[in-house]
């Protein structure tokens, strides 16, 4: 099947199509992850983006569904050097070709992904159109240029839950005194493994839609407000920002990735868009308090402006060892903390899982 990838700067790349026949539009972003394509494709944070892997062979262990981070593929399309046609793993039920076809998502292979990655690093993230069943480069570029920027879309509405629902904590897992604590999780496109990490520590969870007002959240009587990961521009998540403002100082507040940016905005800081983002499982992060380096899994295109933290009560706890961007903050006086990286991994290293989720348990009065 013919396929073409067109970028807004006029770049045209032809290759071989796989998955579904059709057109995908979005920002072209790259990840340096070697494995974890099941997790990445089903991560709601990739909504509105065409995902490209720098690693040359993707799909070699097939698709099992055990590691999905949501029920469906959220990336708009997939760009790879080679998509494995005959995967092997004892749990695999289908190939990545079949997976994309089943989900109605197009893919393109036979592409020089390293060249495209270098271009993204030099020129920044660009809009793109991936068309399968055609090799009309002029049309692909036209579609890419006419597609609205990701910051103009309300992507959160497409991935948040539609109504509140309760998830009891794992039985007998709570190590603190008294009954298990209750966290309200503002779902902006939450990954399944974040839920799993809170659940297995015995914390009762109520997931609420992104548009839930502070008064409604208060009705659930939470012991903790948790802000999830999600897609797009954090400044668009106004209801979540207002929720943090309402509960900061009254109960503990924590967040991951998109949630980290929202917490920082709510406290008075600023965010900005990175040139090409951080995506992959090999991002080095420094803990400025413990003076330690660890490797983290990341997926974000925005960051918190370190200079804007002055006067907010927040301080930088974690810093990216590559480009010195903010990777996590804590409040000087309140139980408010967040990280830009993904301590729950899936996929990626789990160096910081216990550090982050252990702190969640601790601020709720539990035992580590």
UniProtKB/Swiss-Prot annotation:
Pathway: Amino-acid biosynthesis; L-arginine biosynthesis; carbamoyl phosphate from bicarbonate: step 1/1; Pyrimidine metabolism; UMP biosynthesis via de novo pathway; (S)-dihydroorotate from bicarbonate: step 1/3. It catalyses: hydrogencarbonate + L-glutamine + 2 ATP + H2O = carbamoyl phosphate + L-glutamate + 2 ADP + phosphate + 2 H(+). GO terms for cellular component: carbamoyl-phosphate synthase complex; cytoplasm. One of its GO terms (molecular function) is glutaminase activity. Gene3D superfamilies: 3.40.50.880, Carbamoyl-phosphate synthase small subunit, N-terminal domain. Keywords: Amino-acid biosynthesis, Arginine biosynthesis, ATP-binding, Glutamine amidotransferase, Ligase, Nucleotide-binding, Pyrimidine biosynthesis. This is Carbamoyl phosphate synthase small chain.
